[in-house]
């Protein structure tokens, strides 16, 4: 089974994906980390984030062992990932990796921005996570402070709004729910509530298929 989870920045899709993968015993891929890794590699090498050739080279040389590097979680790298992900050739290089990950049995949970629309359009379950931008900014600020980083909530909110616009309007794989995706608004839900809501959706889909 393939479970696709999409949504904007700081919507909680990554935590949800991780928890669902643990619940069902599936592998989990936070696809945003892939783009963060490319952005981080460019930053480390001093290249401009819009340098297509350098970005493609970084994408081809990714080391999955480094996906857990805490440096990839910083706000600055996240902003860079949004820029890098808008480069068509970078997306082409990374789409294959994601599809191969999803295809390996027994199942996988992938979260990102175009899983249900581009990467795995035939996923068994598609969930599109949304949350009010102010709620997302508050959560992202708290996460940054928990890591010991300085964070201004107003600045974080402005960045989230800017990233939403960039992700929705990019020419390749814009951020939007798949026609058959289930909408999950977790603005008023804690982590446990969001996980329960997602499991309810998944179980309803599975029950419907078993009856069919």
Curated annotation (Swiss-Prot):
Coiled-coil zones: none
KW Disulfide bond (keyword) present: no
UniProt KW keywords: ATP-binding, Cytoplasm, Kinase, Nucleotide-binding, Transferase
Any GO MF annotation of the entry: ATP binding
A Pfam family annotated for this UniProt entry: Cytidylate_kin
CDD domains: CMPK
Subcellular compartments: Cytoplasm
Enzyme Commission number, as recorded: 2.7.4.25
Catalytic activity entry: CMP + ATP = CDP + ADP; dCMP + ATP = dCDP + ADP
Ribosomal protein in keyword set: no
A GO cellular-component term linked to this record: cytosol
GO biological process: nucleobase-containing small molecule interconversion; pyrimidine nucleotide metabolic process
Sequence similarity: Belongs to the cytidylate kinase family. Type 1 subfamily.
HAMAP family in the cross-refs: Cytidyl_kinase_type1 (MF_00238)
UniProt-recorded name of the protein: Cytidylate kinase
Organism the protein comes from: Bradyrhizobium diazoefficiens (strain JCM 10833 / BCRC 13528 / IAM 13628 / NBRC 14792 / USDA 110)
């Amino acid at each position: 089974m393939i479970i696709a989870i999409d949504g904007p920045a700081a919507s909680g899709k990554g935590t949800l994906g991780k928890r669902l993968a643990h619940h069902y015993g599936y592998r989990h891929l936070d696809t945003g980390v892939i783009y963060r890794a490319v952005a981080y590699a460019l930053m480390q090498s001093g290249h401009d984030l819009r340098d297509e050739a350098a970005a493609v080279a970084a994408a081809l040389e990714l080391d999955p062992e480094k996906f857990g590097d805490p440096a990839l979680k910083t706000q600055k790298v996240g902003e860079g990932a949004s820029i890098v992900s808008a480069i068509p050739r970078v997306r082409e290089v990374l789409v294959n990796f994601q599809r191969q990950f999803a295809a390996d049995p027994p199942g996988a949970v992938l979260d990102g921005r175009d899983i249900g629309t581009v990467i795995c359009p035939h996923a068994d379950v598609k969930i599109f996570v949304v949350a009010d931008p102010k709620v997302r900014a508050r959560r992202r600020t708290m996460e940054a402070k928990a890591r010991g980083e300085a964070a201004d909530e107003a600045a974080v909110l402005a960045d989230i709004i800017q990233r939403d616009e960039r992700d929705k309007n990019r020419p390749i794989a814009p951020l939007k729910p798949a026609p058959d995706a289930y909408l999950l608004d977790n603005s008023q839900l804690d982590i446990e509530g969001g996980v329960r809501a997602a499991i309810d959706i998944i179980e309803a889909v599975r029950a419907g298929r078993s009856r069919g």
